[in-house]
């Protein structure tokens, strides 16, 4: 007979997660915050958990009625716990000047948001926006009731900041979902792995480089010993674009395009791929493979050491030497955590740039301090990632529009009127074909200006223990635990 403690443990799903700094949907920025927010808050619309290609389904509201000109959206409230007024207030918080949400860019095409009655919301746009419904499925549209609480599947019952978050189910589930969700902050990758092996963690969203060889055999398949325990491994592509951002406001890097091109050409992707055990895809721009509108032509500044050295000469730093001082050019790379993996990755990047004479200093920060420094433009180079919020090239290309400079998502503070013009033309295009022509031009401009060092796109390799059912890999994993089922109670 199971004890009460054993039953409680069996109905609890535990996974590691990076630090969450806010549970306010309007302030959530990281993928980790988005995961937590969607457990506790319903979004206006939702992304189907099963369907591929991805498609939208009702959330707090039914799918919208859209006017013929694409400028008027009418949402009928579906949730019995929310009113149209609460939905309007929650969305308006995204552009509240007193709150200063970093997600205000989501409403840049919105004119008015009104409650027509208690069960109907009307949103009018200033210009047609083909992906607008997808924005309404993002975590940042999580609806807060008047008292600030949510109406999601779970509610936050305890939060020991920087250590643990516990969510308890608030909605009945006859299909056998987990009663409790625990997020644990575990910084050390080896500790995560040992906890997973001992059954203290039910899920690993990623496997560290150091532990990879212990997980797979020589063919890259899951080790038979793990298979015998019922452990499952899932490998899938993601919409996670990883890059080294270049602050265009920096007096050294901003005006010197040749120097930025050299940083790209010196980035040794074959060595980088080996460092990550082949679990990445090369990046030749910001738009991931598989997304309509991605530019597929070769990147002129892919790894080429000889070319990088010549670009350093053209940039005014032959062999990395600043002729004004006679000393090596020194740049600083800001990194948002100090784990073993990030330290080793940073040291490898420093080795790449040492080959062209640049001395790269690594500056490690806590995640909060890092985000603040990036938002305020107090960094020179910074290691960052962007996970697609919806499957559209625009979601990645808006990261470079001048309207979105920090504290918006354009953390590189890239400003180019020619780029803005092509982007705006794409947004107003009548067909996908016409839109893609402008997206391709945007990417051509970016590839020449190099406001990022384009490093890679992540591949996801998840490990799931046998007691967890109904796990489906997704590029949009926010709130996915709401769909999990308990197999071994």
State what each model feature region is.
Residues 250-255, 282-317, 337-344:
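Structural transition elements
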Residues 76, 102-145:
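Surface-exposed binding/hinge segments that line
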Residues 170-218, 359-361:
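Ligand-site clamp/hinge motif
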Residues 63-99, 122, 192-198, 253-255:
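Aromatic- and charge-enriched surface segment that lines or borders ligand/interaction sites
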Residues 16-68, 89-92, 149:
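N-terminal lobe/hinge region of extracytoplasmic solute-binding protein
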Residues 46-51, 125-182, 190, 305-306, ...:
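Gly/Pro-rich hinge or "lid" segments in bacterial periplasmic/extracellular proteins
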Residues 15, 161, 282, 315-388:
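Ligand/substrate-recognition segments at binding pockets and active sites
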Residues 17, 32, 242, 264-296, ...:
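Detector for C-terminal structural segments
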């Amino acid at each position: 007979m199971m004890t009460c403690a054993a039953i409680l443990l069996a109905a609890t799903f535990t996974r590691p997660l990076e630090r969450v700094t806010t549970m306010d949907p309007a302030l959530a920025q990281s993928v980790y915050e988005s995961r937590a927010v969607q457990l506790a808050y319903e979004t206006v619309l939702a992304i189907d958990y099963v369907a591929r290609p991805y498609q939208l389904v009702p959330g707090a509201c039914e799918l919208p009625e859209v006017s013929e000109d694409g400028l008027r959206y009418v949402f009928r409230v579906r949730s019995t716990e929310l009113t149209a007024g609460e939905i309007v207030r929650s969305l308006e918080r995204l552009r509240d000047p007193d709150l200063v949400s970093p997600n205000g860019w989501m409403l840049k095409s919105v004119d008015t948001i009104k409650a027509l009655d208690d069960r109907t919301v009307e949103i009018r746009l200033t210009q047609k926006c083909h992906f607008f419904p997808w924005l309404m499925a993002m975590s940042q549209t999580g609806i807060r009731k008047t008292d600030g609480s949510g109406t999601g599947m779970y509610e936050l019952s305890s939060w020991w900041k920087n250590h643990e978050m516990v969510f308890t189910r608030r909605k009945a589930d006859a299909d056998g979902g987990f009663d409790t969700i625990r997020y644990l902050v575990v910084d050390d990758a080896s500790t995560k792995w040992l906890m997973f092996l001992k059954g203290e963690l039910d899920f690993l969203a990623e496997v560290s480089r150091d532990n990879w060889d212990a997980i797979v055999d020589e063919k890259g398949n899951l080790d038979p010993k793990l298979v015998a325990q019922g452990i499952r491994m899932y490998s899938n592509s993601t919409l996670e674009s990883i890059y080294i951002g270049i602050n265009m406001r920096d007096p050294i890097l901003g005006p010197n395009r040749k120097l930025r091109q050299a940083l790209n050409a010196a980035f040794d992707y074959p060595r980088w791929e080996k460092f990550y055990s082949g679990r990445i895809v090369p990046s030749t721009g910001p738009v991931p493979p598989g997304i309509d509108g991605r530019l597929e032509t070769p990147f002129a500044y892919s790894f080429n050491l000889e070319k990088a050295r010549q670009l350093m000469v053209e940039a005014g730093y032959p062999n990395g030497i600043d002729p004004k001082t006679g000393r090596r050019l020194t740049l600083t790379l800001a990194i948002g955590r100090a784990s073993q993996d990030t330290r080793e990755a940073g040291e490898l990047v420093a080795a790449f740039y040492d080959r062209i004479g640049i001395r790269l200093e690594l500056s490690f920060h806590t995640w909060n301090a890092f985000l603040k420094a990036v938002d305020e433009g107090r960094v020179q180079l910074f290691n960052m990632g962007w996970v697609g919020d919806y499957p559209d090239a625009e979601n990645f290309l808006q990261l470079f529009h001048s309207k979105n400079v920090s504290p918006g998502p354009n953390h590189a503070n890239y400003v180019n009127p020619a780029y803005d013009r092509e982007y705006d033309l794409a947004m107003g295009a009548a067909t996908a074909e016409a839109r893609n022509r402008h997206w391709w031009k945007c990417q051509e401009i970016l590839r020449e200006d190099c406001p990022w060092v384009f490093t890679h796109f992540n591949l996801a390799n998840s490990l799931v223990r046998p007691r967890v059912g109904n796990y489906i890999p997704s590029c949009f994993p926010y709130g996915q635990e709401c769909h999990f089922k308990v197999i071994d109670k």
